[in-house]
């Protein structure tokens, strides 16, 4: 087979804005925060905070309940500040104590002599325990409802009550299927907090509420939450700690240093990624979305341990390559080229590039090298050769891309179910997740890996949620490029007479039903380590975050740019 000639005049292209992050800009970045004195201070603070964990005892509190709340407060804060990895043993011991000695299906009172359950304490304990894998029943919140099934609140909206209802909202967002009381709690708490905001506008509490109302659970990102909570905690005083100023000061100082130490590492990794992008010749591909920096941002928002460099860089490279391939199959590539490229991917032989057009050769080689390198990294941590498994994952994605290319070429609009079955694969969640997770120092034998990989419910739900949300944000732009098939158009085809509003309502309802199911798949007991499930869960949240307001992959110069600045490029003030 001879190489195909390239005729750009006959090709479709997407109307995408150019790369926002020039390589020269990235290479010029600098920061003082990688210096050893900062690391020395961090180590000292870690030791002091460990002592704080150990020093919390019944004698230090007013009573046993105060002691319990102090420990719970510490857990919640070190997690939200992004420093919990230093205190895993302390957190585990504290959680065992909280669950075995203090948790009750009647809620938690605010003092030894009180028989009235406290909403703030109960909601915080419920959320923390559930996220750590403990079995807690949402019926505990029934004691805070009146005979009509409505949540009780005062007319005054005191700061203490507002904090309690904020924690109720945070707890309600991790609902499992069928937990109607948490659905009711979410509606009540959201309404209450929106009404309370004007009364506390400008306060740190209002900043915390605004963040939770905006990002909730599924669009939150660990590093973004850390950045926000550092700003919130700077002036927050909690009633739960005997010496709150001392506790806040030490936690806040460590969080700032850790944030900026990681910021220094991010710059080093980002420079490597940008050089790879430039040296691979991707800048010459004018038809695609250059979002390598944005993908790195997502990776570093969910994998904040310094040792996980292979995860961050691998995720960024693979996702970038995935979006280049998506643009080739959806718009730029001709059908005969796509068939050749698909065959070359399946043969996994660099000699097959001879038959490809020039623009495809570089993409193929970068893809081939990256997948192989990720497999080598994974073998170091997993002890088994993951390449064939990874190749099958990518082949499935390429087949799904090819199917959609045929639909585009013929103007075909499939049934809703046929579209979704293919679209769950073509979104690329599985391909983006598999190899990066295998580079983590978390053993995942094949039989355990398949609890979060295809064809598990975990993977199916994540892929479905992302495909449906992506369609909601992108179907109009895709239609303008000649891509007729989407969950919106397919629903309308299946239901003659229905409107776009009907289709959007149906798709949003599907997502709403799937989120509690996905919460359950994430938090239910299983053989898969909760840490590996957490990374897979956070990858979904990272993608979902960019679809909160619009297609943040295609339009990356608004909210996505702000995310890059707040979590990667800008350190926190010391």
Curated annotation (Swiss-Prot):
The metabolic or biological pathway listed in the UniProt record of this protein is: Terpene metabolism; oleoresin biosynthesis
Question: Where can this protein be found?
Answer: Cytoplasm
Per the entry, the cofactor note is: Binds 3 Mn(2+) ions per subunit.
Tell me the residue numbers annotated for binding Mn(2+) 1.
326, 330
The EC number(s) attached to this protein equal: 4.2.3.46
Keywords associated with the record: Cytoplasm, Lyase, Magnesium, Manganese, Metal-binding
Question: Which Gene Ontology MF annotations are present?
Answer: alpha-farnesene synthase activity; magnesium ion binding; sesquiterpene synthase activity
Q: Which GO terms describe its cellular component?
A: cytoplasm
Q: Known SUPFAM superfamilies for this protein?
A: Terpenoid cyclases/Protein prenyltransferases, Terpenoid synthases
What chemistry does it catalyse, as a reaction equation?
A: (2E,6E)-farnesyl diphosphate = (3E,6E)-alpha-farnesene + diphosphate
What are the recorded Gene Ontology BP terms?
Answer: diterpenoid biosynthetic process; farnesyl diphosphate metabolic process
The organism's superkingdom is given as Eukaryota
The cofactors named for this UniProt entry are: Mn(2+)
Binding locations of Mn(2+) 3? 478
The record's section on Pfam families has:
Terpene_synth, Terpene_synth_C
Where on this chain is DDXXD motif (motif)?
326-330
Task: Give me the residues that bind Mn(2+) 2, please.
Answer: 326, 330
**Record's domain comment?**
The Asp-Asp-Xaa-Xaa-Asp/Glu (DDXXD/E) motif is important for the catalytic activity, presumably through binding to Mg(2+).
Q: What protein family does this chain belong to?
A: Belongs to the terpene synthase family. Tpsd subfamily.
State the function annotated in the UniProt record: Involved in sesquiterpene (C15) biosynthesis. The major product is alpha-farnesene.
Q: What is this protein called?
A: Alpha-farnesene synthase
């Amino acid at each position: 087979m001879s190489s195909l000639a390239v005729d750009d005049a006959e090709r479709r292209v997407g109307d995408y804005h150019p790369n926002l992050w020039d390589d020269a800009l990235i290479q010029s970045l600098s920061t003082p925060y990688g210096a050893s004195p900062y690391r020395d201070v961090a180590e000292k603070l870690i030791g002091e905070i460990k002592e704080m964990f150990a020093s919390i005892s019944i004698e230090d509190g007013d009573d046993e309940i105060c002691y319990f709340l102090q420990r719970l407060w510490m857990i919640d804060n070190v997690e939200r500040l992004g420093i919990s990895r230093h205190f895993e043993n302390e957190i585990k011991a504290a959680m065992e104590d909280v669950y075995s000695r203090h948790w009750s299906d009647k809620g938690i009172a605010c003092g030894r002599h009180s028989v009235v359950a406290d909403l703030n304490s109960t909601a915080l304990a419920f959320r923390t325990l559930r996220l750590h894998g403990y079995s807690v029943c949402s019926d505990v919140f029934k004691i805070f409802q009146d005979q009509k099934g409505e949540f009780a609140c005062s007319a005054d909206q005191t700061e203490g009550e507002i904090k309690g209802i904020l924690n109720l909202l945070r707890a309600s967002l991790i609902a499992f299927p069928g937990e109607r009381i948490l659905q009711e709690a979410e509606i009540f708490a959201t309404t209450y907090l929106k009404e309370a905001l004007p009364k506390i506008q400008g306060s740190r509490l209002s900043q915390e509420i605004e963040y939770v109302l905006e990002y909730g659970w599924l669009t939150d990102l660990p590093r973004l939450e850390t950045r926000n909570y550092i700003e919130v905690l700077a002036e927050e005083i909690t009633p739960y700690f005997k010496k709150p100023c001392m506790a806040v000061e030490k936690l806040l100082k460590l969080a700032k240093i850790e944030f900026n130490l990681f910021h220094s590492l991010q710059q080093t990794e980002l420079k490597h990624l940008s050089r790879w992008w430039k040296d691979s010749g991707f800048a010459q591909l004018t038809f695609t979305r250059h979002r390598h920096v944005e993908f790195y941002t997502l990776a570093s928002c969910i994998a904040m341990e310094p040792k996980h460099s292979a995860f961050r860089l691998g995720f960024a490279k693979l996702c970038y390559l995935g979006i280049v391939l998506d643009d080739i199959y959806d718009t730029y590539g001709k059908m005969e080229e796509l068939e050749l490229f698909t065959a070359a991917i399946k043969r996994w032989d660099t000699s097959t590039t001879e038959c490809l057009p020039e623009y495809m050769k570089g993409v193929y080689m970068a893809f081939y090298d990256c997948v192989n390198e990720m497999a080598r990294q994974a073998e170091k941590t997993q002890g088994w050769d993951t390449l064939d498994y990874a190749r099958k994952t990518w082949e499935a994605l390429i087949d799904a891309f090819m199917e959609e290319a045929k639909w585009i070429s013929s103007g075909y609009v499939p049934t809703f179910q046929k579209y979704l079955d293919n679209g769950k694969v073509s979104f690329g969640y599985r391909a983006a997740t598999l190899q990066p997770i295998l580079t983590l120092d978390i053993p995942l034998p094949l039989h355990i890996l398949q609890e979060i990989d295809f064809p598990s419910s975990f993977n199916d739900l994540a892929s479905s949620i992302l495909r449906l949300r992506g369609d909601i944000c992108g179907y109009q732009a895709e239609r303008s490029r000649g891509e007729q098939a989407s969950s919106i158009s397919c629903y309308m085809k299946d239901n003659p007479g229905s409107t776009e509003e009907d289709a959007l309502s149906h798709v949003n309802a599907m997502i709403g039903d799937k989120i509690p199911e996905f919460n359950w798949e994430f938090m239910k007991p299983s053989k898969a380590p909760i840490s590996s499930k957490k990374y897979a869960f956070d990858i979904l949240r990272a993608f979902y975050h960019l679809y909160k307001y619009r297609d943040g992959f295609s339009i990356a110069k608004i909210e996505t740019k702000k995310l890059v600045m707040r979590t990667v490029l800008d350190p926190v003030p010391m």
